[in-house]
């Protein structure tokens, strides 16, 4: 092998070494973030509230004489969605704020660590917490549905619905983290809640595209995430299959939105003076 080939192999090896080193730093920050959040009360409070929302559906079903199982089912999915999104907003909006208040970010950035890696580590730690939260609530919901339907009630469309709700919470957590890079934790929560509310009303925004403010609503429809893509509605209860390309498109759209939120957060924190 000539010298050019040897030099090329050496560059590739160094690239892998640097990439592995960066990944280890990101995973270390993610692990610390995960363990920090596990010690917080907000995680268990939201988890308890989510479990209560799932249980409320059982009591609400006794108020309906037509398809009480449907009441339990929709209460359960709504409770899981709201609980995961609430946890993503509350934790994502406060992750960076605590670092600025405690001045721990200054100590971290004194080390050979990129701010982008710091953001990624924080987000991946939050993803770990959201995954654990989602898994526990999903198990609780499946247990309740098995009791209500007197047997196993798990289908492919039901699993797809759970996964899409999980992706929705990841998007919201990413944008909550982005908002926290340039404002306070309280305002980040407010912005994230408004972001979530508007992102679930795209079908209603079409009716507002009239008059002089038509351009404004069109811009909002383009900029805001389409959270409606992650809600399958009554199709899940009646087990109506979704086209595979639609589900795959929703998954790719979720990764695109997460990438956009992290890119925006990285751009802001790189330009910020500490």
Where are the regions that the model predicts?
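Aromatic- and glycine-rich beta-strand/loop motifs that create alpha-glucan
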Residues: 19-44
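Short cytosolic juxtamembrane segments of multi-pass membrane proteins
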Residues: 270-274
């Amino acid at each position: 092998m000539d010298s050019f080939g040897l030099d090329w192999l050496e560059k590739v090896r160094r690239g892998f070494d640097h990439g592995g080193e960066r990944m280890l730093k990101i995973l270390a920050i993610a692990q610390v973030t995960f363990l920090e959040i596990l010690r917080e009360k907000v995680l268990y409070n939201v988890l308890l509230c989510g479990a209560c929302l799932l249980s409320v559906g059982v009591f609400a079903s006794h108020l309906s004489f037509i398809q009480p199982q449907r009441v339990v089912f929709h209460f359960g999915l709504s409770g899981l969605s709201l609980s995961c999104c609430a946890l993503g907003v509350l934790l994502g909006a406060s992750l960076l704020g605590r670092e600025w208040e405690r001045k721990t970010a200054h100590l971290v950035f004194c080390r050979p660590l990129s701010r982008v890696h710091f953001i990624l580590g924080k987000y991946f730690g939050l993803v770990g917490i959201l995954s654990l939260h989602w898994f526990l609530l999903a198990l609780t919901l499946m247990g309740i549905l098995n009791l209500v339907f007197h047997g196993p009630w798990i289908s492919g469309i039901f699993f797809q619905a759970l996964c899409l709700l999980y992706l929705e919470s990841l998007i919201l957590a990413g944008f909550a983290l982005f908002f926290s890079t340039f404002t306070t934790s309280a305002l980040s929560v407010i912005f994230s809640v408004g972001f979530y509310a508007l992102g679930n009303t795209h079908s209603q925004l079409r009716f507002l595209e009239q008059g002089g403010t038509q351009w404004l609503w069109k811009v909002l429809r383009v900029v805001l995430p389409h959270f409606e893509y992650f809600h399958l509605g009554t199709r899940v209860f009646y087990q109506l299959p979704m086209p595979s390309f639609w589900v795959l498109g929703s998954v790719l759209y979720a990764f695109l939105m997460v990438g956009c939120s992290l890119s925006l957060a990285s751009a802001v924190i790189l330009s910020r003076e500490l």
